[in-house]
Amino acid sequence: VNRPTPTPPTRLLAIDAGLRAGLAVYTADGRLERYRSTNFGAPSRLKKGVYGVMSAVEGLRRVVVEGGGPVADPWAREAHRRGLSLQRVQAGVWRKALLLPRDRRTGRDAKEQADEIAREVIAWSGAPRPTSLRHDAAEAILIGLWGVLDAGWLPELPESLQPG
C-alpha cells in the first residue's frame, strides 16, 4: 500500500546574527519551538556552521535575519541556496512592532525588555524554560515573533504578549 509521506511541518528560523548568534525556531502556528545561543567564535566556523544549523530544522521554509555584513551574509547565501524565503530585518523595525516607545529609548532598555518579552513568548509557546537566557537568544525569539506576524502565521500578537 502506497501511503503519502506526511509533509514536515513548516518552520521559520530567526537569527540574531553575529559570531555569537541567537537562534529561534517557530512552527507554522506561530509558536516558538526552540531557541539557543551559539558561539561560532570565528568567521570561518560561522560559514561552516550555518549549513548544519539550517539542516537541523525540519520543514524550514522561512529565514529572518537581523544584522548585516559578514555575520549575516552566510545565512542569506545558504537560504538562497536552499530556495527558502529570506527576510532581513533591522532591530528598529521589529522593536517598533513589539516594544513600547519607552522601552526603545536606549539599546540597553530594549535588550532588557526583549529578555522579559522573550520569557513571556517561551511561556505562551510552551517551549522549554531557560536556565539562563542570553540576550542574543532573547532577541532571536523576538525577531522570530516579528517574522511569524509578518508572514501571517499569527494574525496578531496574542493578548498576553501585547505591550503595555
PLM feature segments, named:
Residues 1-164:
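Phosphate- and other anionic-substrate recognition elements at nucleic-acid/protein interfaces
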